[in-house]
């Protein structure tokens, strides 16, 4: 329903100095003339100018607030339609009253993300940029914001366009040979195969950025695990620089998970303090320990916390053996006490690791630990040096489908099958790739994407 006019409050709920009501559609200018009276008796409003005056209720004529207004004419607006923004005082009642006046004047309440959806449908932005709008709003760390702004500026779209151009080049070569076999000299098979192999490599390189992009967008989860009384809760408090977990000398104080996010070098890392792992007949403790192993199985990284003031026991060695194969960082706590634990025993269990000594009590080694946590989660994600990352499962699935079709085209040509089979694969690859920027996307996918937006954006 792009022909109707929509409106919504565009600023967050709550009180503030300024609030914004946004209107988009063909009736935006009419609504402005109906509700607004300029303090300088202006009746013809120039686009992109700010005007000061009173905004009144259309039914009673009562002044609602003293406001500023700005009209932006299609197509040079965010949505590509006539757009009106009303800047009023940021009180809840004021904003609701202004919005109600606008709705009474012919607009309807916008759906979540409908302004950005209209921007996409009116070719102001592509779908990767539309998704990036939501990511910019929801970004909680500098890396997440950096990745979102990259997409908003069109860098992912440029990469997708480049891949699309390469696919079209191959498609032209194949289909020309099919349609004009007598008039067109078909390029050597090695030339087409070379182009397809390069395409496959480029697609693989972009796909390999997904894990890193996902960490930047959603953050990572790191579980602190170990025996009771190794200082897991103290370490969590030290990393957070606040007393979040209860710390006592009594082993087994922590039974439930305690989770809190911290920002490490621009990446959001959710730290999880867990119950101590040890043999027990206590049913509650047994259930807590079972849940610890479930958390460990889904974590992006594990901090194995050991007590440096004690030698390894047989019980310790059983836990260490079970943790082999995890993305793990051995950390030895209580560096402020006499060292009894031997590093070589830890390295023997986890070859290639470099155990880090810390003192959660005095903060010793915590700065280095944060650096190692960053390396731990980014190393698993496969940190990339390129400028463009994908961070959406939707993008990943579309790229995987594209790569699959390119691989099938390669196989067809290598097996000496008709060029028509390869041409069909390339057409399907183009369709899959077009889903990313929205060229071949369905209404269901659009509904799913924009339903996660806030109203007013």
Swiss-Prot record:
The record's listing under Pfam families reads: MMR_HSR1, MnmE_helical, TrmE_N
The record's listing under SUPFAM superfamilies reads:
P-loop containing nucleoside triphosphate hydrolases, TrmE connector domain
- Tell me which InterPro entries the record gives: G_TrmE (IPR031168), GTP-bd (IPR006073), GTP-bd_TrmE_N (IPR018948), GTPase_MnmE (IPR004520), MnmE_dom2 (IPR027368), MnmE_helical (IPR025867), P-loop_NTPase (IPR027417), Small_GTP-bd (IPR005225)
Tagged with keyword Hydrolase: yes
* Listed CDD domains: trmE, TrmE_N
Cofactors, names only: K(+)
Q: What EC number(s) has UniProt assigned to this enzyme?
A: 3.6.-.-
Cited Gene3D superfamilies: P-loop containing nucleotide triphosphate hydrolases (3.40.50.300), Probable tRNA modification gtpase trme, domain 1 (3.30.1360.120), tRNA modification GTPase MnmE domain 2 (1.20.120.430)
Q: Which NCBIfam families match?
A: mnmE_trmE_thdF (TIGR00450), PRK05291.1-3 (NF003661), small_GTP (TIGR00231)
The cross-references to PANTHER family, in alphabetical order and at most eight, read: TRNA MODIFICATION GTPASE GTPBP3, TRNA MODIFICATION GTPASE GTPBP3, MITOCHONDRIAL
Protein family according to the UniProt entry: Belongs to the TRAFAC class TrmE-Era-EngA-EngB-Septin-like GTPase superfamily. TrmE GTPase family.
Q: What is this protein called?
A: tRNA modification GTPase MnmE
Q: Give the species.
A: Syntrophus aciditrophicus (strain SB)
């Amino acid at each position: 329903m792009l022909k109707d006019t929509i409106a919504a409050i565009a600023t967050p709920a709550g009180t503030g100095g300024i609030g914004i009501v946004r209107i988009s559609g063909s009736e935006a200018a009419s609504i402005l003339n109906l509700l607004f009276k300029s303090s300088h008796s202006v009746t013809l409003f120039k686009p992109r100018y700010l005007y000061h005056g009173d905004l009144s209720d259309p039914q009673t004529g009562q002044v609602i607030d003293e406001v500023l207004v700005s009209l932006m004419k299609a197509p040079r607006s965010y949505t590509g339609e006539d757009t009106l923004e009303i800047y009023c005082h940021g009180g809840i009642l004021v904003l609701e009253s202004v919005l109600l006046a606008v709705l009474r004047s012919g607009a309807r309440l916008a759906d979540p993300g409908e302004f950005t959806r209209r921007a996409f449908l009116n070719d102001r932005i592509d779908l990767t940029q539309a998704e990036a709008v939501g990511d910019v709003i929801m970004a909680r760390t500098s890396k997440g914001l950096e990745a979102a702004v990259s997409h908003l500026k069109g860098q992912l779209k440029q990469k997708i366009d480049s891949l699309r151009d390469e696919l079209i080049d191959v498609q032209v070569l194949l289909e020309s040979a099919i349609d004009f076999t007598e008039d067109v000299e078909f390029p050597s098979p090695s030339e087409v195969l070379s182009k397809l192999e390069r395409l496959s490599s480029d697609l693989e390189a972009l796909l390999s950025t997904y894990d890193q992009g996902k960490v930047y967008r959603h953050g990572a989860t790191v579980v602190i695990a170990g025996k009771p009384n190794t200082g897991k809760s103290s370490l969590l408090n030290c990393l957070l620089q606040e007393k979040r977990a209860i710390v006592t000398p009594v082993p087994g104080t922590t039974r439930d998970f305690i989770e809190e996010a911290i920002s490490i070098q621009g990446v959001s890392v959710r730290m999880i303090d867990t119950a101590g792992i040890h043999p027990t007949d206590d049913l509650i403790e047994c259930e807590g320990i079972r849940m610890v192993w479930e958390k460990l199985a889904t974590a992006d990284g594990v901090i194995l916390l050991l007590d440096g003031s004690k030698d390894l026991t047989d019980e310790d060695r059983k836990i260490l053996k079970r943790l082999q194969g995890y993305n793990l960082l051995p950390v030895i706590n209580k560096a402020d006490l006499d060292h009894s634990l031997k590093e070589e025993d830890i390295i023997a269990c986890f070859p290639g690791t470099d155990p880090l000594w810390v003192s959660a009590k005095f903060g010793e080694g915590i700065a280095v630990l944060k650096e190692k946590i960053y390396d731990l989660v980014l190393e698993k994600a496969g940190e990339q040096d390129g400028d463009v990352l994908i961070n959406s499962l939707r993008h990943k699935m579309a790229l995987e489908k594209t790569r699959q079709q390119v691989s099938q085209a390669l196989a067809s040509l290598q097996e000496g099958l008709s060029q028509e089979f390869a041409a069909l694969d390339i057409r399907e690859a183009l369709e899959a790739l077009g889903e990313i920027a929205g060229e071949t996307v369905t209404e269901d996918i659009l509904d799913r994407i924009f339903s996660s937006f806030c109203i007013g954006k």
